[in-house]
């Protein structure tokens, strides 16, 4: 998916180097010099320039349909946000959200905008190849996006207060046909909107437009002068947009014929970053979106919430009076005096005595190899107007007054005087000392002769010239140097900073690239989750450095295990023989299929975010496939047998019992289960000298026999549910009185003991019967709330035969997959956290579809689950599995490999019973290997059962 950016001309050449992105995926240009094209003409220019570079001999139409593209308009003079005019508003650094995990310390408006646009384009129908958006907004969507209809033009809008809509475009739809655009308005008055509301609904245009290839070609045609290749001014919104709809405001035969769909952005939020004031107000709004202290990791309380400092060194204390403050890429020395309503950008390291009046901003721009341009301005300055007009202000006062206070006349100025943006008034100096003196004179000390003399002898630049000539590499280098110091400070002050909620994978790359020492080990009294993050960050830094990282990584997993074990460390067990000498306890369980939300149950993600999973318990070929038999034996030892593996082991000592970490051992699970039941010293309420002594006190030895009538690596939660079945049978045998919830919680701990990791959904999925939505809150005590769902879609004759389960004969062990994904969870990887958040929301959609009894929607959502699993782990769908799917996918509504994927079983939702017959025939005749076969699945209405002989 290619990104096309329209940028300030000075940024175009250095963008790829500064942002460290490749040129193939990112195309940049600027509007032609001296031409105003509007957003429509600018879109045409951007597409034409990209086509000229990448067409490779194809026609424009062929090139257009070749791939999807995101166009971002981020050029312009940025008169109302001068502090970020040289580097473009789209690259404005944005502070990490105090309530969000997985963000980057170096994030900017572009990196925050892009994920939503990419998500929209991934959902767009095949004929929609072009998305157009603005570069000075940040748009969030808190809910899953709806499906995107087939149309020539698709626009997103927001339900907003009418007063806000008066500043933007508005989509009006007849109340009788809300899905159709009736017409569009540009910046309507409140009176117009009030009149309109009687018959119409209106959405505010948020500037996200998707165009079909036909719509693009018409837009480009309208952007050119008639019978000419020369572009003219044509606005996407006020020209093209007003010609759209059933009753368009502009008559245009071709544009009028385009079909239009208007979509409300689900859970949409709109933050504008177009002006200096909005820079602060929008950042404040997004930071204050969440007040729930449980979601805010750090313990820092700012003197004033409207106070943002990043990539900076501040040597003065900040207080509540310093409201509406933005300091970025700057050094504020100990002799500075600041007030409120400031934006301070680009200030190099200094030792100035500088007083900044309230409402005044300071911008320093590197020019050439050594020069600095001093640009003070007012927070409300708009950088337009004739210099003699009293409404034209600099530093918040009329420009003429600013001049007269400093004993300057208009003859001291060079260049135009009809537009403040074009007047050369800002001096360039070559030393930090001179920079401080001239700023004092320009800001608050107009009588400072030394400062005036520097101004008079300096070369001067206009705002336009500053943007055109700024040395952006120096600007970025200074920012990076400040950020190096910030990384160190954030790590040291982790309790009061956002450090351990950042994307630590990104942090590790920065630490290595910048040559920073890795953070020190956290003390034992630090928060457990912070210690886990700390260890995994250290491991990632060592790995990137090519050093041995495994001890640090293992320490992170050990801390996670310890945190989960803490939950039962004070609930030690005293097992008592609770059967007759000739009795056998028989436990059996179904397996589970995860329909949506799998992975969100896995620690540590579930511990800091909670999880949502929809799954169902199933029996195979008419029986629960996991069975455990426990009976007393005369000798005081433990006998372990596996029917399916044909193995046996006798355990006589505590050491032998606690040797359960060996992956692949047939008896790891029963050893760990018996340990948890109180037969190991760590979990026993009574101390014994030996296992034999304990068993004598118990009254018998123990014989445990396992039967797993299902292949390993099946993806049906076999190991977890087998563990629960063993725990459940031992619980009954030993009179421990655990309920099903306790059994499942101890299974989670058992898996940590085995070092295989894993979440809670497998055991709850099998132990609890039927179809259910399982949900947990954040915290180490993961005890899901269970909501049982109707089983109509799985048991009704119309649908029962449409659920197919096919054993592929391909196996894959989940441990390696788990370790990789869990490591990413430890590191707050933004890619993984975003996917997991989508999965969590997706589980609620699945829950809704099952409750509504919508079979088609259910099948579609199963398919979406599969797409999410593939995005999370590329190894989920190996070629051998894809080959099987290719044979039958046209007959399904959805399909997935349960569990971690990569092999095991393939679950399919056939479109109808006839399609199910066809699928059975195809796969029976084209079996990929001798082990592949269909297995009959039925919904389990009992879950885990235990009985006695």
UniProtKB/Swiss-Prot annotation:
Gene Ontology molecular-function annotations: ATP binding; fucokinase activity; nucleotidyltransferase activity
- The keyword ATP-binding is annotated on this UniProt entry: yes
Write down the chemical reaction(s) this protein catalyses.
L-fucose + ATP = beta-L-fucose 1-phosphate + ADP + H(+); beta-L-fucose 1-phosphate + GTP + H(+) = GDP-beta-L-fucose + diphosphate
Pfam families reported in the protein's UniProt record: Fucose_pyrophosphorylase, GHMP_kinases_C, GHMP_kinases_N
Q: Locate the region Fucose-1-phosphate guanylyltransferase.
A: 25-191
What keywords sit in the KW lines? ATP-binding, Kinase, Magnesium, Manganese, Multifunctional enzyme, Nucleotide-binding, Nucleotidyltransferase, Transferase
Q: Mutating residue 901 to A: what's the consequence?
A: Almost complete loss of fucokinase activity
Q: What is the effect of changing residue 88 to A?
A: Almost complete loss of fucose-1-phosphate guanylyltransferase activity
Which GO terms of type biological process are on file?
Answer: GDP-L-fucose salvage
Question: Could you confirm whether the keyword Lipid metabolism appears in this record?
Answer: no
UniProt cofactor(s): Mn(2+); Mg(2+)
The record gives the effect of mutating residue 723 to R as: Loss of fucokinase activity
Cofactor comment: The L-fucokinase activity absolutely requires divalent cations such as Mn(2+) and Mg(2+).
- How the protein assembles, per its UniProt entry? Homotetramer.
Domain remarks: Is composed of an N-terminal GDP-fucose pyrophosphorylase (fucose-1-phosphate guanylyltransferase) domain and a C-terminal fucokinase domain, connected by a linker.
Family note = Belongs to the GHMP kinase family.
Return the protein name: L-fucokinase/L-fucose-1-P guanylyltransferase
The taxonomic lineage of its organism, from the top, reads: Bacteria, Pseudomonadati, Bacteroidota, Bacteroidia, Bacteroidales
């Amino acid at each position: 998916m290619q990104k096309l950016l329209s940028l300030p001309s000075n940024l175009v050449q250095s963008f790829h180097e500064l942002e460290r992105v490749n040129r193939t995926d990112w195309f940049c240009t600027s509007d032609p010099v001296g031409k105003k094209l509007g957003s429509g003409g600018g879109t045409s220019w951007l597409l034409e320039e990209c086509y000229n570079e990448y067409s490779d001999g194809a026609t424009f139409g062929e090139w257009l349909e070749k791939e999807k593209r995101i166009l971002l308009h981020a050029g312009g003079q940025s008169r109302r946000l001068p502090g970020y005019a040289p580097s473009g508003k789209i690259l404005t650094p944005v502070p990490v959200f105090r309530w969000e995990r997985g963000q980057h310390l170096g994030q900017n408006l572009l990196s925050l905008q892009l994920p939503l646009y990419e998500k929209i384009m991934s959902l767009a129908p095949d004929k929609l190849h072009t998305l157009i958006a603005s570069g000075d907004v940040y748009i969030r969507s808190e809910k899953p996006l709806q499906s995107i209809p087939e149309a020539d033009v698709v626009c997103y809008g927001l339900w907003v207060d009418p007063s806000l809509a008066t500043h933007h475009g508005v989509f009006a739809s007849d109340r009788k046909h809300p899905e159709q655009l009736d017409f569009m308005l540009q910046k309507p008055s409140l009176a117009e909107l009030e009149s309109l509301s009687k018959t119409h609904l209106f959405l505010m245009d948020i500037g996200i437009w998707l165009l079909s290839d036909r719509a693009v070609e018409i837009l480009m045609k309208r952007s050119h002068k008639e019978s000419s290749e020369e572009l003219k001014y044509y606005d996407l919104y006020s020209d093209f947009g007003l010609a759209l709809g059933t009753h368009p405001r502009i008559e245009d035969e071709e544009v009028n014929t385009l079909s239009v769909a208007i979509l409300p952005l689900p859970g949409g939020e709109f933050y504008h970053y177009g002006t200096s004031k909005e820079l602060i107000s929008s950042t404040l709004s997004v930071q204050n979106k969440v007040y729930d202290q449980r979601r805010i990791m750090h313990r820092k309380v700012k003197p004033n919430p409207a106070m943002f400092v990043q990539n900076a060194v501040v040597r003065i204390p900040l207080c509540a009076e310093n409201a509406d403050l933005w300091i970025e890429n700057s050094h504020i020395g100990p002799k500075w005096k600041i007030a409120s309503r400031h934006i301070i950008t680009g200030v190099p390291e200094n030792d100035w005595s500088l007083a900044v009046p309230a409402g005044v901003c300071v911008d320093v721009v590197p020019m050439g190899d050594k020069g600095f341009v001093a640009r003070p301005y007012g927070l409300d300055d708009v950088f337009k107007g004739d210099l003699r007009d009293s409404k034209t202000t600099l530093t918040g006062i009329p420009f003429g007054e600013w001049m007269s206070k400093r004993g300057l006349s208009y003859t001291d100025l060079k260049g135009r005087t009809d537009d403040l943006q074009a007047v050369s008034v800002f001096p360039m100096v070559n030393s930090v000392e001179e920079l401080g003196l001239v700023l004092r004179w320009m800001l608050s000390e107009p009588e400072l002769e030394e400062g005036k003399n520097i101004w008079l002898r300096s070369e001067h630049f206009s705002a336009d010239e500053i943007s055109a000539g700024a040395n952006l590499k120096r600007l970025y280098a200074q920012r990076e140097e400040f950020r190096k110091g910030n990384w160190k400070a954030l790590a040291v002050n982790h309790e009061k900073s956002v450090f351990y909620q950042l994307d630590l994978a990104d942090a590790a790359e920065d630490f290595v690239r910048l040559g920073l020492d890795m953070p020190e080990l956290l003390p034992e009294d630090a928060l457990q989750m912070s210690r886990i993050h700390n260890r995994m960050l250290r491991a990632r830094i060592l790995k990137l450095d090519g050093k041995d990282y495994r001890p640090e990584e293992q320490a992170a997993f050990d801390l996670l295990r310890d945190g989960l074990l803490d939950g039962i460390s004070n609930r030690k067990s005293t097992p008592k023989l609770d059967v007759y000498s000739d009795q056998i306890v028989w436990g059996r369980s179904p397996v589970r299929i995860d329909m949506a939300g799998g992975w969100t149950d896995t620690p540590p993600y579930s511990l800091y975010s909670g999880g949502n999973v929809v799954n169902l318990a199933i029996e195979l070929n008419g029986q629960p496939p996991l069975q455990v038999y426990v009976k007393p034996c005369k000798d005081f030892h433990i006998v372990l047998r596996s029917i399916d593996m044909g193995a046996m082991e006798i355990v006589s000592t505590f050491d032998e019992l606690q040797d359960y970490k060996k992956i692949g051992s047939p008896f790891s699970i029963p050893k760990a289960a018996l340990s948890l039941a109180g037969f190991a010293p760590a979990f026993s309420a009574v101390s014994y000298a030996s296992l034999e002594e304990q068993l004598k006190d118990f009254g018998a030895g123990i014989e445990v026999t396992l039967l797993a009538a299902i292949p390993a690596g099946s993806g049906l939660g076999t190991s977890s549910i087998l563990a629960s079945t063993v725990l459940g049978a031992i619980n009954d045998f030993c009179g421990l009185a655990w309920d099903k919830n306790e059994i499942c919680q101890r299974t989670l701990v058992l898996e940590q003991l085995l070092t295989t990791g894993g979440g809670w959904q497998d055991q709850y999925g099998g132990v609890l019967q039927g179809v259910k939505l399982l949900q947990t809150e954040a915290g180490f005590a993961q005890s899901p709330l269970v909501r049982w769902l109707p089983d109509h879609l799985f048991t009704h004759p119309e649908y029962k035969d449409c659920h197919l389960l096919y054993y592929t004969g391909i196996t894959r062990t989940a441990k390696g997959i788990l370790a990789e994904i869990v490591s990413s969870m430890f590191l707050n990887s933004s890619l993984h956290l975003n996917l997991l958040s989508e999965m969590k929301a997706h589980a609620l959609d699945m829950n809704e579809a099952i409750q509504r009894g919508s079979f088609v929607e259910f099948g579609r959502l199963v398919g979406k689950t599969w797409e999410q699993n593939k995005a999370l782990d590329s190894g989920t769908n190996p070629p051998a599995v894809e080959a099987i799917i290719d044979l039958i996918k046209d007959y399904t509504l959805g399909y997935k490999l349960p569990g971690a994927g990569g092999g095991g079983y393939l679950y399919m939702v056939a479109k109808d019973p006839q399609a199910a017959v066809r699928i059975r025939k195809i796969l029976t005749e084209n079996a990929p290997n001798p082990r592949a076969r269909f297995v009959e699945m039925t919904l389990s209405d009992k879950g885990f059962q235990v009985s006695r002989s």
